Every structure is written in C-alpha cells, then in structure tokens.
Amino acid sequence: MFTRILILAIGVVGAGQAVEIATGAMLGKGYEARSFYLRDGAGPWKRTYTGSQFRPEAAGRLMNVRVAQAVVHDEWLTEEAFDPEKNTERVIAALDDYKKHGILSISVSLQGANAAYERTKHIKRTRPYKLGPGKGMSMSAFEPDGSLKPRWMERTLRLARELDKRGMVLNLVYFYAYQDEVLRDPEAIDRATVTATDWLIANNVRNCVIEIANEYNGGDFDYGRYIERAMGHLIQLAKGRFVEKGAAFRLPVSASSNGEVKAGEEVMKVADGIRDYGDLVLTHGNHLSPEVKRKRVKELMGNAGIPGPIVINEDDIGRETTLEHLKLELGSCDAIWESGGSWGYMPWVQFQIWPFVDYRPGTSSVVKDEMPEPERNRAYFKAVLEHIAKKIYK
C-alpha cells in the first residue's frame, strides 16, 4: 500500500508551478496577519482577490463551499449503486462555476460527512463506524493502522490538481466524528496525521489548508475524545512534518469548532491547542442567527491572542431552501463579511446528503417556495453564489 502511494508521489513532485497558500501571520513582518496570501510557483505573495476586477474589501479573504463528500466512498453501501470516481468528476465539473462566483476554496473530507441516509427510503443506516455493516458507515481514507487507501488519495490528488489549475485551494479535513473509530487507537490517529501530511508534502500539494478535524469539540470523537484533547499535539505533529521532511513549503493548519458558546461563557472559546499552535481559526455557524455570527466573528477578529484569519467554513440555515431561509443565509454571509471574516456555505440538501448529485448550481437564481424541490435547491445555490460574487467582484 505504501509503495503504491509513493510511486504516485514520485510521478508528480516538481511537476509544474503549484499555487501555494499561506496566512500573513505565517509570512511574518510586512504581511497582514488576518489575511490569506497566494503565490504562483516562486512568484511574489499576494493577498487573495488582488486585482482590478476585485473589490478592495475582498482582499485577503477565502470564500468557501463545503463539498465534504467529493472523494468519498462508503464501503458498506450496498443498498444503491454509487461510483466514487464519477462523483469526484462531478465535483471537478463544477469548479469553474464556483470560481466565477468568487469561490476560492472547497472543503473536502478524508472521512466523509453526514450523508443523512435516514432521509432516504432504501438506506436505513446511521453514521457510526462502530455499528458495523448494515447499521453504520465505513467512509474513511485511512486504514485502521493509519495508513492511506490509494484509491481515495488518487481522487484527492486529482481534485487538488484541478483546483490548482484554477488558482483555487483545497481545505482538507483529516478526521470526522463517528469515522475516527475506523482508526484502532490514538497511536493510529497520530500515524494518520503523519501519513496524510507526508502525502501532501510528497505530492507537492501547496494549495491546501489542513483541517485536522471537523468540529473537534462536538463531543463525538472516540477514545475518550482523544482528537479534542490532543488537538494541540496533532497540529504540532502536522506542522512538524514539513520540518522533518525538509519541505520547501509549509501549509496552514487548524481544526474547526462547532461554534457553540457554552453556558456561563460570553464569547466563543478557542481551544488552547488552536490558539497556541494553529495558523487560523475555523468555526461553524449552522443554525445560528446572522447577528450571533456577526458578534462572534467580530469578537474573534478583535482578540489579539487568536491566530490568523477567521473563517466560518461551514454554514447553513435550517437545512431548507425556502425564501425565508435564503434571506437568513445571505444575511449570514453579510454579517461575517462585515465583521472581517471569510464565509463558507454548506449546500446541505444539494450535495452533502445522499445521493450527492447537485454540485452545480441552477441556471436561475429565482427562488420560489412553490417550485419543485430539486429545481428550488439548485436555484437557492445559484442565489447564494451570486450573492458572494457581488461581494468579490466590482
């Protein structure tokens, strides 16, 4: 298994000029700490959205769409047919649509995401791997020992290269709750962090933000919530691989929180491991009002102890596509933008949940509640993308 991955890496290292991402805090003096920067090959670092076609206030942001299921394969899915290769190709076919609307980054998970099988007629399984075939899901790029599955990584590399061609960025999630239990113990989780990061280095994937875990603080990770407790260690482990391997680049590393404010706390707490070792703050805003999100991003932006840019890289309002929800969705984008952060929309009904099909937006952004649901879902996605485009482009 390791041999196959290594051969894949040798074939591409040094091929072409890769787009590279960093935060201003990583680059140091003379750069804006809360901004994202890109460069082509050995060219100069420039803030994102720099150029005559962009609005000045867009510079340094990283607008995002969550495409968590882009490389997924549920190995226990027998109830319906699914081709993981064609699934990835559908995502690639949608990238130009995303880019022309100002999207620079997509979030993709090496352990999938909530497929909401329970909403279907034929698949009656839930997320936990530990439930076994017929009851749980097996969605993981990792083997139990922390090594990588070649087919998963081939799809991931293909997608990373297609993003690179377009000057776009891969937000790569390593671990997802309920699938971390694929890994047999905490040592295997450490090993998976190392192997995934080494894979990025070996394949010269410079257009990537590493997200160690999705909602690390949600309470659903296994082994005594190891990933949550060891977040600082895991971030340092990933960052250390670039030094250990003598890499010519270093990727931004963090993990996303669920955005909750616990009882008795006035502001959202950023874990010590992320505050002390992370390069940016990733958080989620699902189901929260625009004004709550505005307040939280503003608080984070104003806290000098918080590292790098602030990105809400997963956000949706109620998982419906009505006009009422659209108003709140666009209001969330506005609130985060006006507070200085970057925003990432989660197209929950369009393609996070099974059967992962509507990766492309509709041709019209006119949303009417009386529309057939599939048509309304696509129009809703188009309306969100058009709203983002108006913020990015002059």
Question: Which residues does each predicted region cover?
Answer:
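Sec-dependent signal peptide recognition
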Residues: M1-L8
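Sequence-pattern detector for short linear motifs
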Residues: I7, Q69, K130, R158, ...
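Active-site mouth of glycoside hydrolases
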Residues: E32, G41, S52-G278
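Extracellular glycoside hydrolase catalytic/binding regions
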Residues: R191-A192, N207-A383
